Amino acid sequence: MRTLWRWLGKGVAAAVALVLLYQLWIFAHVLWWIDHDPRSTAFMETGLARQQAKNRDAVLRHKWVPYDRISNNLKRAVVAAEDARFVEHAGFDVAGIQKAFQKNVKKGRLVAGGSTITQQLAKNLFLSGERSFLRKGQEVVITLMIESTWSKRRILEVYLNVIEWGNGIYGAEAASRRYYKKSAATLSRDQAARMAAMIPNPRWYENHRGSRLYQRRVVLIKRYMGSVAVPR
């Protein structure tokens, strides 16, 4: 029996060590990306694999642009659409989490996350798209890492450059070229609102921008984008 407990203890210790090593690996990347731009993300790699399963020659459309070369209209539209209190909180919107919790309890499963921009970025950079409490817990840890080391400006810059904006389309510049044949720096207020409205389900909205739901989102974003604060 003692031998069994000894081996069990060693197994638990090894598992804990592996978890800690994984957290250190993630934190090392977070620190590196303070002033180095991510070349790819977990979501990009998943998206590329999905496309190459249908066409092995498929490539992603993605071009990094610095924060100052992204329209203020798009920054405001995205913050208004996804996280109106972005500059105020430390990575978590308590009101949003409460609403998501109530929705999850009502459904009896994890269907909503109340995710802030930083939480979405954590997921995009490192995690899969599955919904589970374990993955949500890891998302929280990564969010804390990012918020404790990056400026809000850097968080929004990386977010705008890596999120999905359609099938195989990642980042503001590639999306702006795809939908409006222009640079992300020159997006108008209306164009920015329309791009921001796609974020919750970009591959669907890419071909359904005439839907009522999409149009309602655009109207709401345009109504509130002038009143939100964004990093300078």
From Swiss-Prot:
EC number: 2.4.99.28
Residue spans crossing the bilayer: 14-34
An annotated GO cellular component: peptidoglycan-based cell wall
Membrane topology label: Single-pass membrane protein
Reaction catalysed by this enzyme: [GlcNAc-(1->4)-Mur2Ac(oyl-L-Ala-gamma-D-Glu-L-Lys-D-Ala-D-Ala)](n)-di-trans,octa-cis-undecaprenyl diphosphate + beta-D-GlcNAc-(1->4)-Mur2Ac(oyl-L-Ala-gamma-D-Glu-L-Lys-D-Ala-D-Ala)-di-trans,octa-cis-undecaprenyl diphosphate = [GlcNAc-(1->4)-Mur2Ac(oyl-L-Ala-gamma-D-Glu-L-Lys-D-Ala-D-Ala)](n+1)-di-trans,octa-cis-undecaprenyl diphosphate + di-trans,octa-cis-undecaprenyl diphosphate + H(+)
Primary role: Peptidoglycan polymerase that catalyzes glycan chain elongation from lipid-linked precursors.
Protein name listed in UniProt: Biosynthetic peptidoglycan transglycosylase
Naturally occurring in which organism (per UniProt): Thiobacillus denitrificans (strain ATCC 25259 / T1)
Gene: mtgA
